């Protein structure tokens, strides 16, 4: 029996035994379940990460979850795990056939509060008795794709600072929207030790003999999601300034000589990097799965580093809170401007750090960090209050605002 026939037989059997997920969802939309005051849902794009995870952990530690029945929604079945708390359940958003799960649909439709990092437009039924809070996934430099952003539903959306309120109202085509500059819960993780991030980084440094560590977080150029693809390809590797093996080995030699471990964290939307690995010992390439296996939260890991390299990512805005050196790769600035645009004018004026257009610029930044030089500290102090209304207590502030 062919696999195609077998799948059809399974679907046919399911239909005879009961309603399919699609049919159940239609019934839920036609006859919505009652909203229950003690139900709360969390979900994030990379599964148990980012702002929803940080807010959840804060509420758990403060005993604020005890009065709720909590559901965590996961996009990928392989990331789904059971929580030890009796009042916390985990559900996959999709069934075995890759279709939307009716149980996930029901969980959201019954929840009093829904906290998420991107969007939950698939719910299709939003009622006034519910509160949908988009904690969002970053206030950065790059312009948003309006065609995509205007599909995002929320009752409230979080930003880091007052400057971003009007920016997001414009992007979301929501001039009177509830955009709140309460900050991001994930930035609380700079001060916590909930994961094994410190030990994880220490082991990597010990393995290489490095004394200092840099984290490089390039934003995506070639995306796994085609509607988000900027199609910028100055570098065959997919990473700015690393145009090929020669540049990678040059960077690795510099890091080895300076006693620096450089960790390149791949953006979850970036297609796989195309780089050699043989003989590369001081430049390490990691992704979200690597951090998950090491029980290392990304933002707790960032707090342990000595500096950061990025470009147009919101992570640079967050990293300013740590008051550590920043380096910006800008070799594709003009191409990115044409492809995506910027959140505000004169964007380079709000990048308080090394502006790196060449490999020599990048090597100079590595050298400065290795030798403890920080020439842009005053610039960071000047820019920080323009990007962040608050510098701590982000989860607490959100919990208090919504009376959780």
Tell where the protein language model's regions lie, with residue ranges:
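Membrane-proximal basic amphipathic "stem/tether" segments
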Residues: 1-37
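C-terminal alpha-helical cap of glycosyltransferases
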Residues: 391-404
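A donor-sugar binding/catalytic signature common to diverse glycosyltransferases
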Residues: 114-139, 293-340
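Catalytic binding pocket for nucleotide-activated donors in carbohydrate/polymer assembly enzymes
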Residues: 151, 277-281, 312-387
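A nucleotide-sugar donor-handling region in carbohydrate enzymes
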Residues: 10-25, 141-145, 152-234, 238-239, ...
């Amino acid at each position: 029996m062919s696999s195609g026939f077998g799948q059809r037989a399974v679907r046919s059997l399911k239909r005879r035994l009961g309603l399919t997920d699609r049919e159940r969802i239609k019934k839920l939309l036609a006859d919505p379940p009652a909203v229950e005051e003690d139900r709360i849902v969390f979900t994030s794009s990379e599964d148990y990460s980012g702002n929803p995870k940080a807010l959840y952990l804060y509420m758990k530690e403060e005993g604020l979850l005890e009065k709720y029945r909590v559901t965590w929604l996961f996009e990928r079945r392989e990331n789904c795990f059971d929580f030890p708390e009796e009042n916390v359940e985990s559900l996959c958003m999709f069934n075995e056939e890759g279709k939307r799960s009716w149980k996930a649909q029901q969980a959201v439709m019954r929840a009093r509060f829904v906290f998420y990092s991107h969007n939950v437009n698939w719910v299709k039924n939003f009622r006034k008795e519910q509160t949908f809070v988009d904690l969002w996934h970053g206030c950065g430099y790059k312009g948003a794709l309006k065609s995509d952003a205007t599909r995002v539903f929320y009752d409230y959306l979080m930003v880091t600072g007052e400057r971003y309120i009007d920016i997001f109202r414009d992007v979301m085509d929501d001039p009177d929207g509830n955009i709140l500059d309460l900050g991001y819960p994930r930035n609380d993780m700079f001060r916590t030790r909930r994961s094994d991030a410190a030990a994880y980084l220490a082991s990597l440094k010990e393995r290489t003999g490095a004394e200092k560590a840099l984290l490089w977080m390039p934003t995506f150029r070639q995306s796994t999601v085609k509607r988000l693809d900027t199609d910028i390809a100055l570098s065959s590797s997919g990473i700015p300034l690393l145009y090929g093996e020669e540049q990678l080995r040059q960077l690795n030699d510099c890091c080895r000589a300076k006693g620096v471990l450089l960790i390149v964290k791949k953006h979850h939307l970036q297609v796989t990097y195309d780089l050699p690995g043989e003989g590369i010992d001081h430049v390490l390439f990691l992704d979200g799965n690597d951090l998950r296996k090491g029980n290392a939260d990304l933002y707790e890991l960032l707090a342990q580093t000595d500096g950061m390299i990025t470009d147009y990512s919101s992570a640079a805005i967050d990293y300013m809170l740590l008051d550590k050196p920043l380096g910006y790769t800008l070799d594709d600035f003009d191409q990115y401007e044409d492809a995506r645009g910027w959140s505000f004018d004169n964007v380079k004026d709000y990048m308080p750090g090394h502006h790196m257009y060449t490999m020599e610029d990048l090597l100079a930044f590595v050298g400065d960090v290795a030798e403890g030089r920080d020439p842009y500290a005053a610039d960071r102090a000047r820019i920080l209050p323009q990007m962040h209304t608050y510098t701590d207590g982000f989860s607490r502030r959100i919990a208090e605002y919504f009376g959780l």
